């Protein structure tokens, strides 16, 4: 039944979205493959942060450049995503490390199921928790970066003689409006 629903979804996406819908499905498949590869690399003992950085870059490239083409807007969005994710990576790692997140919570650790778990893993659960949080935020960051860079690009096209500080203020206002709209 799930396969049938998935096929119906794909058909509807292609019928409604046309070429863009097909490109979105291909990008989704590429992102799923990238995440699957990252999980496999985590499992075989590859460095979690390097795999996370590589997966983040690859997912960003697939989402931005494959779906939207290579132009000044997508390169600006990619740079914004890279900078934002580096800052978020450090902040998320600090919060996860200080809070002791990762692994089993108190309820799971007290349950009987824990007796059947293999506790001899060579994987740092706080690092995996950081990787999961970072990769989970990536889609929202990409969406916001592309929205703001496209809007600022349009402002610059319609007002070519706008001063840089006004353009930055415009971008900040657009970003605030977009965050407010997205979280209401």
What residue spans do the PLM features occupy?
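Conserved small/polar residues in nucleotide/adenosyl-binding loops
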Residues: 182-184
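Short helical (or helix-break) motifs at transmembrane helix termini and adjacent helical loops
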Residues: 139-155
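Selective transmembrane-helix segments that form parts of the transport pathway or gating/packing helices
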Residues: 82, 174-180
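Membrane-anchoring/interfacial helices and their immediately flanking loops
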Residues: 1-34
